[in-house]
């Protein structure tokens, strides 16, 4: 019953996955077939490396700056499928202009699946090999994102499921066995990133919440914008965990 209530509540939102599903429904009901749906799931590259629901700015930045990665057992034990972005691009290119692909949906994914715990170990081993430092990890029982309005649906309705995909349909157009192997691809991309690390928006509100959990502090010399300093300080010391999280 609780799961049904969660699904009902999530349907009131415009989360990316729900929005895409609604758009697919529109296409299927259109009575036309001049479309093709691509479902790539999670992709990675030299500039994007995810851990559960965390972008690299929320885990890798912490690791490289000596603070603890905050992850959770409930997600770590689930299986996922990560595909190198270039391979997805090759898959898309393989069906462009093919009439047999009209009116069809394709999962363009790797043949492999790993648990998030295994993905984390790949990251940790690579960072240790490259920097000589093994990052600290705090494994909570439950993801803290469950407590944050707007952030929980990706956990409950995606990362809480084992994600393995049937990619046999796209194999009619491209040999997915030639896709980059997940482990070697992640290692290569992370090593490349570590040579020239560049981070996007850091999400200092979330960083403050993580530091509240771990008992750590980010030096304010890392935070260049006053607004971000205030957000970090509020979430580190004042804002209750169940509030709407500001990044």
Indicate residue ranges for each PLM-predicted region.
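Conserved beta-loop-beta element that borders a ligand/cofactor-binding pocket
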Residues: 24-49
């Amino acid at each position: 019953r609780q799961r049904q209530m969660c699904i009902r509540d999530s349907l009131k939102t415009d989360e990316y996955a729900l929005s895409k599903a609604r758009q697919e429904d529109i296409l299927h009901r259109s009575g036309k077939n001049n479309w093709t749906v691509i479902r790539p799931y999670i992709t990675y590259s030299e500039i994007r490396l995810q851990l559960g629901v965390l972008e690299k700015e929320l885990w890798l930045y912490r690791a490289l700056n000596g603070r603890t990665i905050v992850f959770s057992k409930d997600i770590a034990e689930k299986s996922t499928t990560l595909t190198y972005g270039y391979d997805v691009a090759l898959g898309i290119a393989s069906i462009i202009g093919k009439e047999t692909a009209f009116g069809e949906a394709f999962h363009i994914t790797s043949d492999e699946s790993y648990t998030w715990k295994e993905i984390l170990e790949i990251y940790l081993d690579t960072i240790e090999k490259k920097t000589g430092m093994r990052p600290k990890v705090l494994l909570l029982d439950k993801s803290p994102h469950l407590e944050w309005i707007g952030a929980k649906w990706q956990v409950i309705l995606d990362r809480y499921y084992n994600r393995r995909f049937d990619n046999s349909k796209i194999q009619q157009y491209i040999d997915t066995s030639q896709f980059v192997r997940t482990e070697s691809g992640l290692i290569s991309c992370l090593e490349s990133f570590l040579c020239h690390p560049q981070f996007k928006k850091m999400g200092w509100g979330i960083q403050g919440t993580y530091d509240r959990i771990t008992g750590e502090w980010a030096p304010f010399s890392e935070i260049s914008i006053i607004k971000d300093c205030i957000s970090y300080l509020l979430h580190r010391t004042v804002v209750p965990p169940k509030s709407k999280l500001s990044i």
